[in-house]
């Protein structure tokens, strides 16, 4: 039977995701390209957002799959993807962040064979990014409050991931789902710390800063 190395399979799916969104962006950009200068700029911004969303979706997928620690009592696992999920909402905004975080995270479950978690992960991780983006928009007016927005996004991640997965797993595994709560809390804390470290480094990159939610002109 034909087999593909696991790492190559992950890269293959991530590359396909980026190419799909990029080609869609080009198509939509050409379709929406109008004579007025303002509308042309909007099409370019739309293209830029799609490319950024594709990149962050791929990052979320890879980060989720780098390290997996199985959680007792369920078929789930602890991973490092939460940091990217938080940053999806902060950097891309609520809507694009929801899509990038949800798609990238559930793609990791799909590739890893955690099929029962695919829809659950899409909703929960998408909601984390959505809420993180909304909080960031509400308070991220200065450098200090932007950083506070990232921290609050991490707190949201801890609550939604630990609570959301417990509720969903309870209907699947029963009382054994409670065993995953400590692991999900640890995962959320790790996501908070890592996202707080990565945020200033990412924003320092001109392309990401100029494309980021909250830094738009």
Q: What are these model-derived regions, one by one?
A:
Residues 5-217:
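Loop-helix junctions at membrane interfaces
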């Amino acid at each position: 039977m034909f087999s593909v190395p696991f790492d190559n399979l992950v890269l293959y799916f991530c590359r396909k995701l980026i190419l799909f969104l990029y080609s869609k962006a080009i198509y939509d950009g050409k379709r929406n390209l109008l004579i007025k200068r303002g509308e042309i700029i909007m099409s370019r911004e739309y293209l830029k957002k799609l490319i950024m969303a594709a990149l962050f979706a791929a990052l979320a997928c890879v980060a989720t799959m780098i390290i997996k620690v199985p959680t007792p009592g369920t078929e789930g696992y602890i991973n490092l993807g939460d940091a990217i999920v938080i940053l999806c909402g902060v950097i891309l905004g609520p809507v694009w962040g929801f899509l990038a975080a949800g798609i990238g995270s559930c793609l990791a479950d799909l590739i890893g064979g955690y099929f029962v978690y695919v829809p659950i992960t899409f909703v929960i991780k998408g909601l984390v990014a959505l809420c993180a983006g909304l909080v960031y928009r509400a308070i991220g007016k200065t450098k200090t409050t932007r950083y506070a927005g990232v921290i609050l996004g991490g707190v949201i991640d801890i609550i939604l991931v630990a609570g959301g997965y417990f509720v969903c797993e309870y209907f699947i595994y029963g009382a054994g789902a409670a065993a995953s709560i400590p692991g999900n809390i640890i995962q959320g804390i790790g996501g908070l710390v890592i996202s707080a470290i990565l945020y200033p480094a990412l924003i320092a990159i001109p392309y990401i800063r100029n494309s980021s939610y909250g830094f738009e002109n």
